[in-house]
Amino acid sequence: MIMVQHLVAASAHNFASQAAASLVNVSSSSSSSSSSSSSSLSLSSSSSSSSLSSATPTPVASPVTPTSPPPAAAAPAEASPPAGAELQEDGQQAKTQEDPTMKDQDMLEKTRQEVKDPVNVEEPGAIVDTESVMARQSPSPVASTKVPESLEEISNKSPPVQEDEEESESVASDCREFKVLYNHLRQQQHHHSPSSPDKTRSTLDDVSKILWERKQQLQRSSVITAAPTLQPQQHQQPMSDIEDEETLEDVDDADADVEADAEDEELLEQYQNGYDSPLDLSLGGATSAAASAAAAASAVSRRRGRTYSGTESDDSAQCERARMRLKPERKAERSAAYKKSLMKRYYTEIPIVKQSTSPAPQQQLQQQHHLQQQQQQQPHNGSTFAGATALLHIKTEQNTLLTPLQLQQQQQQQQGLHGAAGNGGSSNGNNAHQQQQPLAIPQRPLLHNLLSGGAIHNPHHRNYTTATTGSFPPSPADSGVSDVDSSSSGGQPCADELKARLGMPPATSASAAAAAAAAAAAAAHLHTGTFLHPNLYQNNAANSLRNIWNRSVGVPDNYYGSSGAGSGGTQPGGPGNPQTPGYLTTSYFNAPTAATAAASQRGTTINGYHSLHQQQQQQQQSQQSQQQQQLAHQQLSHQQQQALHQQLSHQQQQQQQQQQQHPHSQLNGPHPHSHPHSHPHSHPHAGQHTHSTIAAAAAAAAASVVSSSSSAVAAAAMLSASAAAAATAAAAAGGSQSVIQPATSSVSYDLSYMLELGGFQQRKAKKPRKPKLEMGVKRRSREGSTTYLWEFLLKLLQDREYCPRFIKWTNREKGVFKLVDSKAVSRLWGMHKNKPDMNYETMGRALRYYYQRGILAKVDGQRLVYQFVDVPKDIIEIDCNGV
C-alpha cells in the first residue's frame, strides 16, 4: 500500500501540475466565486481523494481532509449542480472515506458542485480537479499523496478505472442534473476506492467504516443524492471489503455501459478524450461503491439528460478534451471499454466473451452490473438501496431488468468483483458478499430470468436462479440443497478449500488461470449466465467462494453437466452461502448426491484439480467454439427461460425446461465468467479457483452438449446430468473429475436426449400408429407392398374363386361391378392388409376416397354397386353370369 501510495503520489504530482493548470484555467474562466469554490472544491476533492487513499491504504490521511474546505464548500454546494457533479462525487468519495472529513467534504462537495461549472473543463478527470487543487492549495502532503494514490489505483486498475472514467466523463460531458451526477460520482468513487489493488482487508474494513460514515453523512448532507448514495453505501458496508472492489469495478463497468447506452459516440469520445476522470480519485476511497451507485444514476440521468442542456454537454466536451490532454493513454483503454460496453449493451453475451478473455471483460460485466445498479438505484435510490446491501444488489438486478444480458453480465460482474475482492478482501467483505450473494443471486436469477424473458436477461441463463434452483425440486432443492451442500459438504468444502488454498493454490491457480483464460474467452460468451454469478459471488466471499467453488467442483461439475445451475447453485449453496438455497435448487435435484459427490470431490478434487483443470480447460476450449456458437441460441432461450425461471422457479417442469436451456447459457455463461473471475479469485483461492475451473470445464462440456441438444433435451440432460454428475462426481471425486465432468456433461446430454426422445418417441409412435392403420385402410394399402383397394377388387373380379361368389361384374364394358358379399370382400381386404378388424364400413370409406381420385364412381340407386371410371383393357374377363 505504501509503495502504491508513493507511486500514486509520483504520478499524482505530475498529474496535479497538469490538472492544476487546467483547473486554474477552468476556474479562472468561471466567475471568481466559482473559482474560489473550485479551489475549495479541489481542496475537498484532494482531501477526499486523500481521505479515500488514507481510508483504503492508511487512515493517517483522513485527518488531512477535515480542513477549512467544508465551510467554503457548503455555501456553493448547489450553485452549479451539473458542473459540480463530478466534484461532488469527489467530495462524496472523500465523505465516504473519511469519517472526520465526511461532513467537511460534504460541504466541499457542495462547493465543488458550484465550482464545477468552471471546473467542468477539468471534469475530464476528477483527478485533475483533485490534483490541481492539491497542487494549488495542497491542503496537505497527505492529500496530494492520497490523490496520487487514487491515481495509482486507477492506473493499477486501468480497465475498471477506464470504465469509471468513461462514466465520469459521460457525467462531465453530459453534466446532467447535479443530483444525478452527484450520485453517480459518489457511486463511482465509492466503487473505485475499493477497487484499488493495494487495498487490504484492514483497508476494506476502514473503507467499510468510511462507507458507514459516508452513508450517514450522505444521508445528512446529500440533498438529492443522499438516498442513492446511502443505498450504495449500505450496499457496500456489508460487502465493503469484497464488494467495495467489486462495486468499484462494477460501477466502472456499469458506468461505461450507461455511458455507452446514453451516448455511444460521446462515450467513445469521452473514453478517448478523457482518460483522467474523477474515476481516478474515486478509486482512492471506499466511497466508490456509493459513487458508483450515484454514478449509475447520474449516467442514467445523463442518458435522459443529454437533452437536458447543451451547455452541459459542451462542458462535458471540454472536460473530455482536458482529459484527452491529461491522459491520452486512456483513450485506447476507454475506447476498448466503450466498445465493450457497447457490445454488452447490444450483445449482452458478447461482452461477456470479451470479459472472459480479459480482466477488462470482467470490468465490462461489472460495468453492466453497475449500470443496472445505477438504473435500479435511480428508481430505488430513495429507499431501496439504503435497505441493505443485498437488497441493493437485488433491486439493482430487478431494476436492471432492462436487458437480461446486461443484468446477467452485471451480476457476473458483481460476482467477479466480489470474487476479486473476496480473494483479496477481508473475511468481513466475504461474509457481506456471501449474504449479498444469496440475496443478489436469487434476485439476480429472478431479474435475470425476467430480463431474459424480456430481453436476455439478460439472455444469461440462470441455472442457479430461483427458477433454476426450483427447476427440479424447487422447494426442497432451494431450502434443502443449499443446506445439504452446506451440511454434507459444508465442513468438507472448508477443508477442501483450505487444502486447495494451501496445497493446490500455486498449481491450481496457474492451471485455473490458464483454464479460465482459455475457457473464459470461449466460455465467457456462453457462460454469461447465472453460473458466473454464483461462482463469482462465492468467489467474492472467500469463505463462500471456497465452499461454493468446492461445490461447483463437486456438485456443480456434475450439476454443470446435468444442469448449468449445478455449479452455480451449489456454489451459492456453499456453507458460506446458505442463503443461496434457491440457486442451489437447480443442482438440488442432484443436491444430495451432488453435495455428497461435491464433498467427495472436494476432498479428492483438490488433489486432482490440476489435472482436472487442465483437462477441463482442454474440454472447455474444445467446447468453447460449440458453446460460442450455441451462445446466441442459448442466450435467446436463456433469456426467455430466465424469465420463466423466475416465474416458474417453483414449478418443477418449467424449471427443468428452463434449466435445460439455462444450462446451455449457464454452463456456457458461468464457466467463462467463473474462469475470468476465478482467475483473480483462483490466485487468492487456488483451491476455489480450481473448483470453479473444474465446474466450468464440466459446465462447458455439459453446456456444449446441452447446447447441442434441444431445450427439452437440455432439460432431460440437466436432470440426468445432475444425477449422473452426482454419481460420477462421487465416483470420480479423485483426479479423474475432469474426465467425469465431461462424462457427466455428455452423460447428461445423452440421458436427457434419450429421456426426451424416449418419452416423446413413444408418445409420438403411439399416435402415428393409429393413424397409420386408419390411413393404410383408407388409402387401400397404398403404402403396403401389395395393391390398392381398387386393384384388389379388380383382382377379385378376375379370380374365379371370388368373382361370382363375393363380387361380380354387372356391366363389364362400363366397369360396373357389385359387391355380392360385402362382408366377405371386406374380410378378404382385411386379410390382404393384415387388418383382421376390417369391415365394409371402413372399406367403404376407402372406396369413397376413390370417388375423389376419379378411379371409382358410385352407381346411384344401387347398393354395393360401383363403377370403374377407366376400366383396364387387359383384365381377365370372367363370365359371372355363367357361374
Swiss-Prot record:
Keywords: Developmental protein, DNA-binding, Nucleus, Transcription, Transcription regulation. Residues 19-65, 74-83, 362-378, 407-418, 428-437, 477-491, 612-671 have a biased composition (Low complexity). InterPro entries: Ets_dom (IPR000418), ETS_fam (IPR046328), WH-like_DNA-bd_sf (IPR036388), WH_DNA-bd_sf (IPR036390). Pfam families: Ets. GO terms for molecular function: DNA-binding transcription activator activity, RNA polymerase II-specific; DNA-binding transcription factor activity, RNA polymerase II-specific; sequence-specific DNA binding. Residues 787-869 bind DNA. This is Ecdysone-induced protein 74EF isoform B. The gene is Eip74EF. The keyword Lipoprotein does not apply. GO terms for cellular component: nucleus. It comes from Drosophila melanogaster (Fruit fly). It comes from the Eukaryota. Induction: The expression of this protein is developmentally regulated and is correlated with the 20-OH-ecdysone induced activity of puff 74EF. SMART domains: ETS (SM00413).
